[in-house]
Amino acid sequence: MIELRDLSYSYPDGTPALRGINMKVERGERVAVIGPNGAGKSTLFLHLNGILKPAAGEVIIDGERVDYSKDELIKIRQKVGIVFQNPDDQLFSPTVREDVAFGPMNLGLPEDEVEERVAESLEKVGMSGYENRAPHHLSGGEKKRVAIAGILAMKPEIMVLDEPTTGLDPETADGIIRILLELSREGITVMISSHDVEIISQFAERVFVLNSGELIAEGTPLEIFRDAELIRRASLRLPRTADLLNRLRMAGFEVDVKLTVEETYHELLHLLGGDAYHRLLHFLGEEKQHRLIHLLGEKKYHELLHALKEQ
Ligand SMILES: Nc1ncnc2c1ncn2[C@@H]1O[C@H](COP(=O)(O)OP(=O)(O)OP(=O)(O)O)[C@@H](O)[C@H]1O
């Protein structure tokens, strides 16, 4: 659905931002692009609907090479919707209704179809009833949802969201991810960038790691988060579950890195057998208990014991 071939880009002031990126995303896939600040994630996204034109290389969307003619750009912007990092860059109308209607109106659709799309899109993001509110008076999470609705109203096949959960409380962030998972179930290809490792492991089927404008790795979240050295190089941290198991592994336990809390507990219980809590204490012995406390820190160690006791 998306293919980048040897894509390179430098900003007009000479700052190199992307160097020889090759990337393929299949139709309906959920992918995350991760990497430290300045790695080139936003620059890459701006190439996906022709806002930026590559200095070298090609952008291929749905089998067609973007050729940057006016007609082609209109077509591509219908197909690929981008939700910017800051919703204030996207929302500019006096009311939510007008903002969401802006795209479909520009497509020249009849009024009743525009109305239908506005209602449907606001419903999908849980913002029905906000039609007459002023976008600039909404909360950060609400603005984000209206910005997503504005893109949905264009009925895109690909949605690209630059850091969709940044600055949102955990519950609101989870709500945004649930919306994106639902869109993906409807067949939309969804690509996000994020620094939030918990969100990435919850959302993505495949992860691309960018660093200094280069693609340095790609794989499933598990493949990426198993590679502690890569994570360090990309200035990220491991998800909490992977971090815990990784530390146990370093302490000499035979565990594998898992990403979900459920899988982590299974891994721990598998390690410990039934009656986990008592066996843990017995199994650790004094020396290993000390090593474990040292590695995990006292607080985490007691949290682990407590969690196992609850099982
Ligand atoms: N308009 C611009 N003019 C000049 N340089 C720019 C411009 N926008 C971005 N850059 C530079 O291009 C590089 C890539 O920036 P980009 O915003 O794509 O990174 P990012 O991975 O999205 O970062 P972040 O996680 O901080 O959002 C950086 O070195 C940045 O300073």
Curated annotation (Swiss-Prot):
Molecular function via GO: ATP binding; ATP hydrolysis activity; ATPase-coupled transmembrane transporter activity
InterPro entries linked to this entry: AAA+_ATPase, ABC_transporter-like_ATP-bd, ABC_transporter-like_CS, ABC_transpr_CbiO/EcfA_su, Co_trans_ATP-bd, ECF_ABC_transporter_ATP-bd, P-loop_NTPase
Membrane topology note: Peripheral membrane protein
BP GO annotations: cobalt ion transport
Keyword Cell cycle: no
Entry EC number(s): 7.-.-.-
Keywords, in A-Z order: ATP-binding, Cell membrane, Membrane, Nucleotide-binding, Translocase, Transport
Location(s), subcellular: Cell membrane
Positions of the ABC transporter domain: 2-237
Quaternary structure annotation from Swiss-Prot or TrEMBL: Forms a stable energy-coupling factor (ECF) transporter complex composed of 2 membrane-embedded substrate-binding proteins (S component), 2 ATP-binding proteins (A component) and 2 transmembrane proteins (T component).
Family matches, as NCBIfam families: cbiO
PANTHER family, per the entry: ENERGY-COUPLING FACTOR TRANSPORTER ATP-BINDING PROTEIN ECFA1 (PTHR43553:SF24), HEAVY METAL TRANSPORTER (PTHR43553)
Family of the protein in this entry: Belongs to the ABC transporter superfamily. Energy-coupling factor EcfA family.
Protein name per UniProt: Energy-coupling factor transporter ATP-binding protein EcfA
Provenance organism: Methanothermobacter thermautotrophicus (strain ATCC 29096 / DSM 1053 / JCM 10044 / NBRC 100330 / Delta H) (Methanobacterium thermoautotrophicum)
